């Protein structure tokens, strides 16, 4: 198989169990949403190809389990990340309160060369629930938190309604590209067990 040159961008999605990390990824990559909740065990990833300006990039999005007992997996999966996405449920204050922990955990485990400039993106998910009447974390509170972390970009999303998902991941991809690690990707070198089923690629710029 011939070698294909492209830019591989590794993105890690972190947040408490049940905030919708997997649903956001599936909506972005597969345009599918399931009402059935299935906890992620360990870690999994999906990929999507997209074009940013004149660059063809492969976005590799890692979904790590929110359960504390799986946080020991961090070092292996966080290292080499180009961007970290922090997600919470706007209807669950605890999921917002733990963002500091996730932020610190990532920086500790990933150990980026310059922690102050490493790109983070914050997603406030499930804004569709109860027409927004059940939310407990205000947009202002979330933006204030982002400002305290160096003006992290913030998006309010709904995986179910596909609201703001593409816009959020385009921002994520651009942030990751700015922090890229250029790699030669040999597809035959990826273990079969690590390749997600029904991998979907798109050549369009989202």
Curated annotation (Swiss-Prot):
Any one annotated GO CC term: vacuolar membrane
SUPFAM superfamilies per the record?
Answer: P-loop containing nucleoside triphosphate hydrolases (SSF52540)
User: At what positions is Cysteine methyl ester found?
Assistant: 206
An annotated Gene Ontology molecular function = GTP binding
**Where does it localize?**
Cell membrane
Residues binding GTP:
15-22, 63-67, 125-128
**Domain of life of the organism encoding this protein:** Eukaryota
CDD domains per the UniProt record, alphabetical? Rab7
The keyword Phosphoprotein belongs to this UniProt entry's keyword annotation: no
Task: Tell me which family the UniProt entry assigns to this protein.
Answer: Belongs to the small GTPase superfamily. Rab family.
Name of this chain's protein: Ras-related protein Rab7
- Origin species: Vigna aconitifolia
The root-end lineage is:
Eukaryota, Viridiplantae, Streptophyta, Embryophyta, Tracheophyta
